[in-house]
Amino acid sequence: MAVVTMKQLLDSGTHFGHQTRRWNPKMKRFIFTDRNGIYIIDLQQTLTYIDKAYEFVKETVAHGGTVLFVGTKKQAQESIAAEATRVGMPYVNQRWLGGMLTNFTTVHKRLLRLKELEAMEQTGGFEGRTKKEILMLTREMTKLDRTLGGIRDMAKVPSAVWVVDTNKEHLAVAEARKLNIPVIAILDTNCDPDLVDYPIPGNDDAIRSAALLTKVVASAVAEGVQARAGLSSDKDAKPEAGAGEPLAEWEQELLSQAAPAAEAAPAAEAQAAPAAEAPAAEAPSTEA
């Protein structure tokens, strides 16, 4: 079964690029044609590259890796947060702070400070302080949560980064490349494909397009989690370092939802078989 269909891509407007005067010549090979001054992206190539990116993300997570979701533009903020949260991955959908990857040691200290402030608030640590002190601590906590809340549980730099709009997120892309972290990203017609390891040619400005492709990456993460727990149908996958790590609560929940569905299918077939063999009841005669 295809990861995503051509119709879904068309319906979400993934094929629309930028105006012909706003483009990167390196993207020429991904362009199908132009209509009324707008480039049309070759969705056949998009489907091919989606499969490659999907497989990479799935294998990365299956072997214990994490994927950082990045998208701070207005069109991507909601889907980035929703999909990353759905699969328990870290995300950045507000402002990218310089050094978030290359200076992660300092960022991690700020994360510890955020957790410290939250613990103080929950355990009554603010009691006995002046109103001004409480206000300052609350403001600090709110600011940290807004900028770092999406990566609060990220204990180390990610194994890969998913990016919506590489031009806007050029700092994130540059830091990932500096640390040799693979970059998976939507490539619009004004982007540089040389900066991305796993490109997906598509529209990074439309809300539905960004949401669809982000959902595809999140689904690959979910499948990787299941593979890590041994539920994958691929029995030939070789375990790597990190594959035996204990699963987090969100991963256990994801797997608990997948297991009953897998068990229900054989049971339904077993019930259907006797029903098919039983003779059909004769309809009562309508004759007088």
Swiss-Prot record:
UniProt xrefs under Gene3D superfamilies: Glucose-6-phosphate isomerase like protein, domain 1, Helix hairpin bin
Gene Ontology molecular function, alphabetical: structural constituent of ribosome
Region (Disordered): 228-288
Intrachain S-S bonds: none
UniProt feature, compositional bias: Low complexity: 257-288
UniProt GO BP: translation
GO CC terms, sorted: cytosolic small ribosomal subunit
Keywords, sorted A to Z: Ribonucleoprotein, Ribosomal protein
InterPro entries per UniProt: Ribosomal_uS2 (IPR001865), Ribosomal_uS2_bac/mit/plastid (IPR005706), Ribosomal_uS2_CS (IPR018130), Ribosomal_uS2_flav_dom_sf (IPR023591)
Annotated family: Belongs to the universal ribosomal protein uS2 family.
PANTHER family, alphabetized: 30S RIBOSOMAL PROTEIN S2 PROKARYOTIC AND ORGANELLAR, SMALL RIBOSOMAL SUBUNIT PROTEIN US2M
Name used for this protein in its record: Small ribosomal subunit protein uS2
